[in-house]
Amino acid sequence: MSTEDLYQDDVESLEDYDDETAEQEHEHEHEQQWAEPDDESEYAEAEPDDDEQEEQEEQQAPSGLDSLALDLTLRCGELRLTLAELRRLDAGTILEVGGVAPGYATLCHGERVVAEGELVDVDGRLGLQITRLAAQP
């Protein structure tokens, strides 16, 4: 038998195997896709209650990093001025700020929003009462 004949036999056997294997895999994928989830499937898992969720969060947070100080910024809106408008600013000038409702501000770490809240008076000082936390990545 020549080398060419051996090669042709190998190619034919591979083609037969590939066709059968591909067909079986396709049937298996189709069955899995449309199968009903059973009680033990990942879809049937119950959501953890609040106590379990708090414990998981405490376990995930490294305690050594808890004392790390972060610089946060309180943003109460945005405005855009030309250089000429900036030069004309004087005491008593009122600037219209956009991007946030009056009395509200956004708490940020760098460019990442951490929380939103309402500006409040805390013993004569400005404070932020959190009304909504940003989703964690």
From Swiss-Prot:
It is found in: Cytoplasm. GO terms for cellular component: bacterial-type flagellum basal body; cytoplasm. GO terms for molecular function: cytoskeletal motor activity. Transmembrane segments: none annotated. Residues 23-33 have a biased composition (Basic and acidic residues). GO terms for biological process: bacterial-type flagellum-dependent swarming motility; positive chemotaxis. InterPro entries: FliN-like_C, FliN_T3SS_HrcQb, SpoA-like_sf. Residues 1-22, 36-58 have a biased composition (Acidic residues). The keyword Nuclease does not apply. Keywords: Cytoplasm, Virulence. The HrcQb-C domain interacts with the HrcQa C-terminal domain. Belongs to the FliN/MopA/SpaO family. Homotetramer. The four monomers assemble into two tightly bound homodimers. Interacts with HrcQa. Component of the type III secretion system, which is required for effector protein delivery, parasitism, and pathogenicity. Probably participates in the formation of a C-ring-like assembly along with HrcQa. This is Type III secretion protein HrcQb. The lineage of its organism: Bacteria, Pseudomonadati, Pseudomonadota, Gammaproteobacteria, Pseudomonadales.
